[in-house]
Amino acid sequence: MKMSQTYNQHVVKKGNKSLVLQTIQEFTPISRADIANQTGLNKGTVSSQVSELLNENLILESGPGVSSGGRRPVMLLFNHLAGYSIGVDIGVNYILGILTDLQGNIRNEKLIKFHDRTYEEIKDELFTIVDSLIESMPESPYGLVGIGIGVPGTVSTDGEILLAPNLNWKNINLRKTMEAKYNVPVQIENEANAGAYGEKKFGAGKDSSNIIYVSVGIGIGVGLILNGLLYKGNNGFSGELGHMTIEVDGPECRCGNQGCWELYASEKALVQSATEHGIKPESGQALSLESLNELAENGDAHVIRVFEEIGGYLGIGINNIINIFNPEQVIIGNRLASCSKWLEEPLKKKQGQTLFTHQKDLSIDFSQLSTHATALGVAAYASENFLTIDIQEV
């Protein structure tokens, strides 16, 4: 037999195994016969792959299912507790880390808030969170299978953080540092791309194929899912729409541009606008998204107007995106999603100003995952990297 034939047979076998596992994961519990029907594989192939997956502790046998005639079939379950992933969202002033099982269920989480930290200081906080999550991890056949990290900046295809202006990071190889310390695969992803994937897999975007995810925190990032797939652009740098110009003669942004969208429609812009309007919390606490939300909830009309102003600017940028991509769904996530009550009306007003042809079958929704979309997205990347058969490595 030629080597190429052997290689191709090996690739097919690995592909079949991955297909069987994915089918069990999606339709659990499921019988061997139903796997064959779902995948089109013959029963012998299914039986062989199921045996391997059972030996590897990635699936389990449960009690018999309902019979359609003859013996009741043995049902198969995806073993979501075979291992665990860690997903981390590094923001400008916080780190959120979550521990998930292989199905994406959150088993533990840790949050650290900070202000104006250096890279080295943030790295130490990151180690603290990851160490704590690992310590809390239950015993399992595979233990920690991977770590995913979302960052607010451009990330190269090999995981180097090229530029994160709001963190003052440039050319940071965090992936190499993390893999050396924890000895597991580490994936670094733009936080908005990860958030878009998290919403598509677990949240408001489950039923949509063309999604614009707008991550609104200290800055603004955008993740694009087009025809069901995450779009990253030629070099992986798509989605930096927080830096599109909406005011030609506007103030200078950290990125070097003028009049960037995030200078007018982000959490930072909200707090800055409230400060300029002389708004002060009654308790004497510092101005923040939380304190402004509380004032708005208590009926402060001045604060509500500031929210509505930010919502209007948010709508301007979203309209530009709608006109370019014609999506079926726009999801607004990250920290400003908690202010939907004050942002929704001005957003709808701006939406009415976009091309009427683009408004048909379009929905604008707020995140169902709130601040967890990015962490869930990168944790899912880590789990799927472990579970997927990569033919490049065969």
Describe each model-derived feature in a short phrase.
Residues 101, 156, 225:
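Short, acidic, Ser/Thr-enriched surface-loop or helix-capping motifs
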Residues 109-111, 117-121, 170, 176, ...:
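Glycine/GP-enriched mid-protein hinge/lid loop-to-helix segment characteristic of carbohydrate kinases
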Residues 96, 153-155, 194, 202, ...:
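Active-site/binding-pocket entry motifs
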